[in-house]
Amino acid sequence: MTRRRLLHAGTLAGVAALLPAAALAAPSQCGPWPLWSAFVDKHIQRDGRVVDFLNPDQRSTSEGQSYALFFALVNNDQVLFDKVLSWTRHNLCGGRPDLNLPAWLWGRDGSGAWRVLDANTASDGELWIAYALLEAGRLWSRPGFLKAGQQMLQLIRTQEVATLPGLGPMLLPGRTGFVDNGRWTLNPSYLPIQVLRRCANADPKGPWAAIAANSARVLRDSAPVGFAPDWTVWDGKTFNADPKRGNVGSYDAIRVYLWAGMLDAGEPLRARLLQDLSGPADLLAAQQTPAEKIDTARGVGTGALPVGFSAALLPYLSALGKPALLKAQAQRVPAATQPAAAALPYFERTLALFGQGWLENRYRFAADGRLLPAWRTPACAATT
């Protein structure tokens, strides 16, 4: 499968937490979220379909649907959550989410018909959908969502989890196409530790705790100079460059730093993981700019750094305690009301939603993976 290739006031307010001398007024994390509202207006149709306009097929993906579910939950919008979930179930799961994992790609085919374009699965989208369902069930007291989240975890266990020799239980990127003659292709960005922790809590007899521990090894050993690759291949003993894609870290790998930066301080894997992924921070400290594409074996980049990548690095730089670097990257990301923000493509907008939203304290992850949305805090509850 091939896949894919805001904010000054809000983000700088988050930066102020690391910059005590900065005279920056913090906006209320309880108030309207302009960046999310703009995303909804542009990318989410009334029926709940999330559209990526960058591609001619005007595609929708399980990833896009999963992120929309997550941010609808962060924004406490049950109506939108229900619409996005309904579209996902009917169009990606064939109307039977209890039996079918969602197809990863839906859009317009060459004849102009709208349909599933690739029935293979993508475990990153499914993991986030399961997470959103579990947390929506808990936070909104909707037991049907808890059951649906459990059902999806069971489907993922059955179809996308394998025990790799020399490594142990691992989440494969999808149902088919990632195992070839004793070699397993993995995507490090599909392994957010906090999401796996929540899965382990919801399914304690499942493989999720082991996958989380093994994921730390994937992230460490596939990043020999501190840069995560988009894809890596395990041969039973070592991690190797993907033969088709090479040692490249780009639009997938940027999320590895994002997920690591958002880990709770109580996560036992956090400190070592941030150390293992020091590449982008080291480049910035050397007054160099991380690039669009990084040769992960040499730490050498090509292409201008996309704005969304800067947004994704915000939690990471915050976690590393790098206030000057954090401020510099925050200043690259346009405010939600600026034309430059409106011009950002779908994927960069999602990175900005994750990075900016976290820095603005609109949500956090607990050490056990639970979502801690701002709207559940006493301060926000008092404003409603």
From Swiss-Prot:
Enzyme category, top tier: hydrolase
Keywords, sorted A to Z: Carbohydrate metabolism, Cellulose degradation, Glycosidase, Hydrolase, Polysaccharide degradation, Secreted, Signal
Give the matching Pfam families. Glyco_hydro_8 (PF01270)
GO CC terms on record? extracellular region
Tell me where it resides: Secreted
Task: Report the principal subcellular site.
Answer: secreted
What's the EC number here? 3.2.1.4
GO MF, one term, reads:
cellulase activity
The metabolic or biological pathway listed in the UniProt record of this protein is: Glycan metabolism; bacterial cellulose biosynthesis
Signal peptide interval: 1-25
Catalyzed reaction equations: Endohydrolysis of (1->4)-beta-D-glucosidic linkages in cellulose, lichenin and cereal beta-D-glucans
Q: Where do the TM regions start and end? A: none
What are the positions of the active site?
E63 (proton donor), D124 (nucleophile)
For biological process, the GO terms are: cellulose catabolic process
InterPro entries, sorted: 6-hairpin_glycosidase_sf, 6hp_glycosidase-like_sf, Glyco_hydro_8
Main function: Hydrolyzes carboxymethylcellulose.
**Stated family:** Belongs to the glycosyl hydrolase 8 (cellulase D) family.
The name under which this protein is listed is Endoglucanase
Organism field: Xanthomonas axonopodis pv. citri (strain 306)
Q: Which gene encodes it?
A: bcsZ
